[in-house]
Structure formats: structure tokens, C-alpha cells
């Protein structure tokens, strides 16, 4: 068995290293016998597949001398994250299963699964016009976010636009030509409290929430609307998204971040209101609407903010959300648009 163990090897074949939630991937394990002596029983198992495929137990194969066996697997990615597919276990035994030996193989193979981005351009979202808040331009401050190109300095150009590093290199002044943005913005609060991950079902719903949020941010970028995301995670984040590069940064953030916030969502909202002038649009993305969140949103409405709520339509059996559907109806009655983001996702899929 020691000889058999030394002659055994495994390789991996895969379609890509980058996927999105909902993608189906093909992974093939190639088990090899590099020796000339057949190995009657080889139990091949991928550690990662064991956690991803329900009922997966590995494969028991016969490996002839100088032969290989291809073991194909299909995976449906339901959760975002970085997956390590590099660990494979090969357990060899003789014909009578008396002698056994195990060979653990590690090959560096990390697969990234990003949130799913849906095209919301053809979906009717009530209150869409409210997203487009005019940024206060009375100050006359230019927005220097998007560099379109570089050109030589012309008399009268704003010195703030001078590319000093490039100018020093060439011995003459060059300025940055900035691409204008639409002058519109939206403010999006995301409830990533740790309660979102209370069960396997909650984890899937949390994925829907993140998928919808990044899809909404992408819609804003495509329509040249600056988006400020306020994320209630353990490490609270304020992320501005107004370019494709910034959107990619948002995708990287959600690749590695799960719901782990400990501060109550309502307290998080209140602590960040100072960043948002009254009259601006605020979008709230939360799996459910409990009594506390309902009261805060009604107060925001009274303070002059324009509010939209994006929620998941499933009723949850816990005390905090016992009045969930009733709260949604109350918010609608006071003029707050409430949108079931799960229904939006399902419409896009059709």
C-alpha cells in the first residue's frame, strides 16, 4: 500500500475561477495511478464538494496501472464567498480491504463567487424618480471623480485640475479632463445584522438581499447616479459608488463580507442621518420590518426625507417580526413606498 500511495495523484479541471451566485460550475477530479501496479479500490473525495453537494460521499474507483479516471461533478453556487477547492483525499486499499493508506493532496485553487447582478433597467420600481436627488451645486465645486483624459494646460484652466506629477515629468503643464456625472445621488441603508444568518433559509434570503442591493447600485451607476451605501455590518461601512471601478470595489467587499453586525439597525440609521440633508431620498434594504424599524421610518418621513423600503416577502416566525406584514401596510398608508425585493428578482429571472 505504501507503493500504491506514492503512485497515486489527483488533478483538477474547472471552467473558471470566477462565478456569480446562481451559476452552475463543472469540476472534474482526475485521479491518476502513475505506477504500473493496479490499485483495486481508491476512495476519492473532495473536501469542498462534501460541503457543497448534499449527499456527496466521494467516489470509489478502480485505478489500473498507468491509468486515470475522470470524476465529473456539477455545482450550483448558492452563496457568495471564496471557496478552497484544493484539498483532495485519496484512500487506497487492497482487494480484501485489509491494508489501507491515505494520501491528502493540496493544490492551491481558490474559486471566487460574487453576488448575482440583475438588470433592473426594465423593472418598474415605484418612487424611481425620487432616487435622483439633485446634489447641491451652489458651491460651484467641481466633481473630480471621473478622469476622462489628460490634455495640455490652456490659459484659464482651473489649477486644481493640473496633473502635477505628469507635468513635472514632461516640463510643461497637463490637466485632467474630468467626465461629468449626472448631479444626482441616492442613499442606501443595508441591514446586515447578524440575525440575518439565523438559519440556512436565512442565509439564502440574505444572498437575495445582497444580490438586489448590488443590482440596484449597478442600475444607479449605469444611470450616472451617485450612490452612498451605509452598511450595518460589524465593521460599519460607508461606501460611495459612482463609477464602474467603485462598483467593482463594492463587489469585492461583499465577496468577503457576511451579515455580522451587532448594532441595532435603527440605531445605525439614526447615527448616519447627519450625512444626509433633509429632503433627500433614503432607501432601506432589510429582510424584515420590525416595530422599531417601522417607527424610525415613519419619523424619517415626518422629518422630510423621501423613503423607500425594500424587504423580503416571507413571514418569519420570531417575536421581533410578528407584525412584519402589518408594519409594511402601515408604512404604505403613510406614503412610504415598500417594495418586495424577492418579487423584483423573480420578475427579472422570467
Positions of predicted regions on the chain:
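An amphipathic, basic-hydrophobic helix/alpha-beta surface used to engage anionic
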Residues: 1-239, 281-284, 299, 303
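Short, charged loop segments at secondary-structure junctions
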Residues: 237-270
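Short, surface-exposed amphipathic charged segments that create phosphate/polyanion-binding patches used
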Residues: 126-128, 245, 350
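Residues that form generic nucleotide/phosphate-binding pockets
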Residues: 11, 153, 250-257, 327-330, ...
Amino acid at each position: 500500500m505504501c507503493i500504491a500511495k506514492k503512485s497515486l495523484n489527483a488533478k483538477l479541471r474547472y471552467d473558471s475561477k470566477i462565478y456569480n451566485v446562481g451559476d452552475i460550475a463543472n469540476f472534474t477530479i482526475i485521479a491518476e495511478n502513475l505506477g504500473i501496479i493496479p490499485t483495486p479500490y481508491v476512495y476519492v473525495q473532495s473536501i469542498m464538494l462534501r460541503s457543497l453537494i448534499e449527499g456527496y460521499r466521494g467516489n470509489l474507483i478502480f485505478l489500473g496501472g498507468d491509468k486515470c479516471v475522470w470524476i465529473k461533478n456539477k455545482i450550483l453556487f448558492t452563496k457568495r464567498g471564496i471557496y478552497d477547492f484544493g484539498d483532495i483525499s485519496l484512500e487506497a486499499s487492497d482487494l480484501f480491504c485489509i491494508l489501507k493508506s491515505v494520501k491528502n493532496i493540496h493544490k492551491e485553487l481558490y474559486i471566487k463567487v460574487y453576488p448575482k447582478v440583475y438588470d433592473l433597467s426594465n423593472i418598474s420600481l415605484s418612487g424611481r424618480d425620487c432616487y435622483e436627488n439633485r446634489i447641491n451645486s451652489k458651491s460651484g465645486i467641481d466633481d473630480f471623480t471621473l478622469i476622462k483624459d489628460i490634455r495640455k494646460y490652456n490659459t484659464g484652466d482651473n489649477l486644481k485640475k493640473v496633473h502635477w506629477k505628469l507635468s513635472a515629468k514632461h516640463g510643461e503643464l497637463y490637466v485632467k479632463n474630468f467626465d461629468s456625472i449626472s448631479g444626482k445621488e441616492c442613499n442606501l441603508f443595508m441591514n446586515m445584522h447578524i440575525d440575518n444568518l439565523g438559519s440556512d433559509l436565512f442565509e439564502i434570503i440574505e444572498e437575495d438581499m445582497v444580490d438586489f442591493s448590488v443590482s440596484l447600485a449597478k442600475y444607479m451607476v449605469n444611470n450616472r447616479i451617485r450612490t452612498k451605501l451605509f452598511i450595518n455590518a460589524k465593521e460599519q461601512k460607508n461606501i460611495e459608488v459612482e463609477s464602474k471601478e467603485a462598483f467593482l470595489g463594492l463587489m469585492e467587499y461583499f465577496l468577503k463580507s457576511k451579515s455580522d453586525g451587532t448594532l441595532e439597525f435603527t440605531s445605525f440609521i439614526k447615527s448616519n442621518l447627519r450625512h444626509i440633508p433633509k429632503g433627500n431620498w433614503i432607501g432601506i434594504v432589510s429582510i424584515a420590518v420590525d416595530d422599531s424599524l417601522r417607527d424610525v421610518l415613519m419619523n424619517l418621513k415626518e422629518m422630510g426625507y423621501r423613503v423607500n423600503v425594500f424587504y423580503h416577502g416571507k413571514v418569519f416566525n420570531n417575536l421581533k417580526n410578528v407584525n412584519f406584514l402589518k408594519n409594511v401596510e402601515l408604512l404604505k398608508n403613510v406614503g412610504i413606498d415598500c417594495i418586495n425585493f424577492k418579487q423584483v428578482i423573480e420578475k427579472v429571472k422570467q
